[in-house]
Regions:
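Glycine-rich, basic loop-to-helix element that forms the pyrophosphate-binding segment
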Residues: 97-114
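Conserved donor NDP-sugar-binding/catalytic core segment of glycosyltransferases
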Residues: 126-172
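Donor nucleotide-sugar recognition loop
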Residues: 127, 194-224
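Short, flexible, basic/aromatic active-site loop/helix in glycosyltransferases
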Residues: 151, 156, 168-198
């Protein structure tokens, strides 16, 4: 049924079974080779940042991206030595944010300097599990009805940190399935399925740059 619907709508997708009977996974192929601007705010965290950059280089199939590191008031000599090491990498650009910390403003600042058609907002402590992670997110984000794509995030103890957000949960918004074992699929298997969400976290968020600009970027009154 999923295959027929894909053919009927003219949407290309690779349909496969999941471990749950009656539920399917659709992987949308990337159209063309658009540039993705990966935006990573950073303060002092040399080893954390290095691990993230190595993940992008060695454990990411889709490689047409630039990396924008936003240096945010670091104080350690170690991180500035590392920035100097990175200066020879043509994919990496370093911006300096000299004002007080404001997560929204920092990312808006970087987005204004981005050359990519797509923006990937990425925390420096995120590591990929599957090499095709960016390719898969981009395939979904290219769909005309999609403005942004989030990711399932897992804590080091193999429990869920984020599998989408629900507006109104816990007052303003809350993460679904927090602290549930990552190998569990949850209510109606929603913890393991591609689906529409009220919101997603910007810890790993891919957006069309055009949509981000139309929305006015992040609200800078919300600093964190």
């Amino acid at each position: 049924m999923c295959i027929r619907d894909s053919e009927r709508t003219g949407t290309k997708g690779e349909v496969s079974h999941t471990q749950d009977l009656g539920f399917y996974r659709v992987k949308y192929p990337v159209q063309g080779k658009p540039l993705v601007s990966v935006i990573i705010p950073n303060k002092d965290e040399k080893e954390t940042l290095q691990t993230c950059l190595e993940m992008l280089e060695k454990n990411t199939v889709y490689q047409n991206f630039e990396i924008i590191i936003v240096e945010n008031n670091s104080t350690t000599d170690e991180i500035f030595r590392y920035y100097k090491e990175l200066s020879g990498n043509r994919k990496i650009h370093l911006l300096r944010w000299g004002k007080e910390f404001n997560y929204s403003a920092i990312n808006n600042f970087a987005a204004a300097h981005a050359k990519g058609e797509y923006l990937l907002f990425l925390n420096n402590d995120v590591k990929s599990i599957n090499p095709d992670w960016l390719e898969e997110m981009l395939g979904v984000c290219q769909r005309p009805e999609v403005g942004g794509v989030g990711a399932k995030l897992i804590y080091p103890d193999n429990t869920i940190q984020h599998a989408g957000c629900v507006i109104g949960m816990g007052g303003i918004a809350g993460h679904m399935f927090v602290d549930m074992p990552a190998d569990r699929t949850g209510y109606l298997h929603k913890a393991s399925l591609l689906q529409d969400m009220s919101a997603v976290t910007a810890a790993c968020l891919l957006m069309k740059k055009e949509v981000f600009e139309q929305a006015g970027g992040f609200t800078e009154e919300l600093a964190v």
